[in-house]
Amino acid sequence: MEVDHVIKVTLTNEILKRISEIDEKRFSLSTIEMPPVIKNRLRKNSKKKSSYASNKIEGNPLTEKQANEAIDSDPHKHFLKPEQEVRNYFLALNFLEEKLKKKEVFSKEMILEVQAMVEKGASKEKIGLRGPMPPGMLFAVYDSETGAAEYIPPEYIDIPDLLDELVEYVNTTDDHPLIIAAVVHYQLVTIHPFEDGNGRTARLMSGYILDYYGYGFNGIGSLEEYFAYDPDEYYASLQMGLPALYYSGRENPPHPEIWINYFLRMMELYSKKVYELSKTSENDELDGSLSYLNAKEKEFLAFLLKKRLYEFTPIEVSKMLGVTNKTIINRCAKLVNNGLLIPIIVKTRVLSLIHI
């Protein structure tokens, strides 16, 4: 299959320099030993930051504190739309984590699954590929203040082929993984295959490519946070000064390096932040986690670490300590809440295996 409608990237000196800088940080990060308990806490916090930041770009009004509270709330309660959006993104990140464990390749099905998670709770027409508009109506992204069409994406009939081209590109190209991630981000935003959730889906799928090729830095840090610092620059870089109509240049932009350089610059900042965080946060994060534990819970954690019990069942540990199974489960629950343990579901029994 030809991939005529996927942006072509020429590797300029600036692009190569940025890739080299990111690769250098990636190598440096690989030399840092971090205990699993610290990684788990940092990953959870990073997913929260990404969920908040990615939705903030789209105009979600929640503060970061409110977003975190929504993520941590009982899933059975009723959520307002902004809260549901943040929760959806967090769950989509968890979903992609599971895909990554299986090393699932990038596919159209994966894109559709992710968008359905992003739009969970929305009306049916907002989930899945957009269809034809009523006669006399134009599908476009409009400026909320002026009402002018900011972007007119491709016709709905072209979307399946454009997505097929993107999937073909991702799975056959020999481009550098950072370039692939940038291209996926641009193409999904530009193809605009859905009625809603395009930007969030693009950021999630681009992030999956980074994770797949080892540029997600173990899930630590938030790239979305850097995009959210200046949404105007983010959108301007995607638009590249081109006309609003997709068919008038955005399908084959003359200067794709505008977007690529922006994306790599954000990646560079992100990689530096992750490196600094990984170098300095070990003791701070552990101290912060332990401050929420009482003496018995700290003693329990120390026991697990001393005995190198990185995987265990509560019943096993209860026998070792001479306490009830319920006591161990209660202590495990507190450690789970503080990101110090990860429950693994075996068959139907939650907490039947704990991984520290």
Language model feature labels by segment:
Residues 1-354:
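FIC/Doc superfamily catalytic core
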